[in-house]
């Protein structure tokens, strides 16, 4: 008789036969049902942070409260724009943008690379390349690449309105309009439904873009995006997902849900730097000149009469200068803080008579260590290498001290590469819509065959890039000469190609195919063999080229 077990099933089922037969079909069905009950979507993807979430069903949602959220974005963006006017920030932004994209004559700032795209014909690849050129022309990117990337970097967001002719969709995108980044914000419309157990499940999530250009005056600079007599719109506009291409900085959202810009870490260091610079200027001006000290003999005058006498004398000899921190000028405005005032001191009868003396100035006016400290903190917040701050220094492209700056420059290089990849989302979206509208491909092929493998290459400075590549190649060839005697005994040729020359799998296959192709074309010379079957100057190294030999014909002529 089979016994009862007290195992796993015994604990929860009150005991059961150990050898009882389990219905695997019913068990699997119950597990599937449990998975389905847990598969209800009850939360949004965390990747949707930084957007406004509205709840509604059908057309019941409204945009109450979105306007105030948009005003918060406007305030943040305007603060970034005001920061960009500071010389230190302007210099840092210029360094970063010039490293992200280089605008040289007769060169396109960005090109599309389809080398890794497989599964499509060469004709489709040519069409993709042509569509990408059309997108670059619509953006006028060849002429405005620096300005567009700089504006995206400063504002921390950028949006384009994609305009298509509804009567001729095959014509593709007709125009790309850059919208004011202060006036637009993504909004997710979430529709929920009540499920069993009282759980609110998310039925659908729709992306919209809320645009309100009515409040476009910059509260920091006072500038308005439009004329005072013209308002672009007196109503709130809501765009569909396919009408707008919107890219933010990609940073983690703040506590208020706003995605900060790339200048956000520099707010505090910049304020400290500006305050320190102003204090340094004020100290230098106040302590540099010798101030006058008036000692007035008031005799036996009463307190009130003495004060009136001093006030009258101060009016005659008043010397008051003020420093305007907004312009850096020295003015005589009375409402500003005085920085070089005279001293007026009364004297009673029996002491010395009226006297005018001087108070010595400061002797430590050249101390700038505190200013340089905050300037370095500012550039550290913006990921700028310290080597970029020395204007009088030369650019180190290679050499003995290359390793000393490699770590900092490598970090900056990766940072700029991340900015390029982030901004490339614009090209990806514009190209996708252009290809689908023109019928070059469909959504499925784009997502499966093109999008995962397409790359956008930004043009860098040609001279510096060439020198860097030459320096790297020379170092690798020097290492190759070092390990060459050990190839075949310790290292294989494949190891040398991949670990010494740092060639990728694609590069190894490509070079081997090119060598075989060039041999077939006869680009490598053939040499005359000697009596032993070898040729003069032969080398036993497996890494060096061995030309094909012609059979020995008894002649010492080495001509081919």
UniProtKB/Swiss-Prot annotation:
Coiled-coil residue spans: none
Transmembrane regions: none
InterPro entries (UniProt xref): Portal_Gp20 (IPR010823)
BP GO terms, sorted: symbiont genome ejection through host cell envelope, contractile tail mechanism; viral genome packaging; viral release from host cell
Region (Disordered): 526-560
Any one cellular-component term (Gene Ontology): viral capsid
Entry superkingdom: Viruses
Keywords noted in UniProt: Capsid protein, Late protein, Viral capsid assembly, Viral contractile tail ejection system, Viral genome ejection through host cell envelope, Viral genome packaging, Viral penetration into host cytoplasm, Viral release from host cell, Virion, Virus entry into host cell
Subcellular location, record wording: Virion
HAMAP family associated with the record: PORTAL_T4
General function of this protein: Forms the portal vertex of the capsid. This portal plays critical roles in head assembly, genome packaging, neck/tail attachment, and genome ejection. The portal protein multimerizes as a single ring-shaped homododecamer arranged around a central channel. Binds to the terminase subunits to form the packaging machine.
Quaternary assembly: Homododecamer. Interacts with the large terminase subunit. Interacts with the major capsid protein. Interacts with the capsid vertex protein.
Family from the record: Belongs to the Tevenvirinae portal protein family.
Record's protein name: Portal protein
